[in-house]
Amino acid sequence: MQKFLVLYMAPARVLEEWMKLDESVRKNQEVEMKAGWDAWMQANGSMLTGMTAGAGKTRRVTSAGAEDVKNDVMMFSIIEAESQDAAATAFQNHPHFGIPEGWIDIMPAHVLSRMS
């Protein structure tokens, strides 16, 4: 089994627009999304290594200093799968795609021997 970093992405502007919706509309959408997540987890949850988290506000650090920025990362997971293609297949019908313009990036997680 190989480890992969999964990034659940959506344009920041889409999320900002979603937050402007009436709270009852958002809550209904959240209930639908949770049901989709529960179903997906039932079928594919064994891939997850136990690390899934939402991404908070971004502080970018460069050689020139640090600043607050917006990016499109909503959440991340660490998963195990036989291959990157197998991981991609499992995520093809993920409920994250209920978010307009949402996408999922899956990349190999290479452990750096001196960093672990």
Language model features by range: what are they?
Residues 1-116:
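Conserved, structured core segments of small domains
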